[in-house]
Regions:
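"…together with the soluble PPM/PP2C metallo-phosphatase catalytic core" -> "…together
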Residues: 1-183
């Protein structure tokens, strides 16, 4: 259900996001490193964010686990940082700072990579990994839909791994992101 809610929400919100982006002149203009030749709307990520968040909120309405609250808060901080950066490019330190703040929220909710290492090392690895993955996906964002497509492929594998390991919360969150990316 979470997959289809995210997919549908994103499909419904994308045309609105596209119109709003052009109306607000919230577009990426062609440049030398860009593949597109015409202005591209910059609110597609907001539609994907909305699809995933709405799906998670509907599925976990009422009494969500603290982990879900942490993921929602962190995702919101990172998404807002990206949205602000799309509107008015932020200096690298500010963009990293917003991402770092979002990922600190995850860590504060106890979300971390669990390795046979001291806990502080696990948290440091978690922060570095999340910053690295986020910026790697951000670097792919020079062609319309490329980031969403690659994110959908990787999220599919996360979903499969979570299901085979009975990690149903991770599976639900991955299904929400997958549905949103495919929308």
């Amino acid at each position: 259900a979470v997959f289809f809610i995210a997919l549908t929400t994103t499909l419904v919100s994308l045309p609105w996001a596209r119109r709003a982006a052009f109306a607000l002149d919230f577009v990426d203009v062609p440049a030398q490193r860009k593949v597109h030749r015409t202005p591209m709307p910059l609110l597609g990520g907001a539609a994907i964010f909305l699809g995933a968040i709405v799906a998670v909120l509907i599925i976990y309405r009422g009494d969500p686990e603290p982990t879900v609250i942490g993921v929602l808060l962190a995702t919101t901080v990172v998404a807002l940082t990206g949205l602000i950066d799309d509107y008015r490019p932020l200096p690298a330190w500010a963009k990293l700072g917003g991402q770092f703040l979002g990922f600190l929220i995850l860590v504060a909710f106890g979300i971390r990579v669990r390795l046979p290492l001291p806990e502080p090392v696990d948290y440091a690895i978690t922060l570095l990994w999340l910053l690295g993955i986020t910026n790697a996906v951000n670097f792919l964002d020079n062609m319309d839909g490329l980031s969403a497509g690659i994110s959908a492929v990787t999220t599919s594998f996360i979903l499969l791994l979570a299901l085979t390991n009975n990690q149903f919360l991770v599976a639900a969150l991955a299904a929400a992101l997958l549905g949103a990316c495919l929308g």
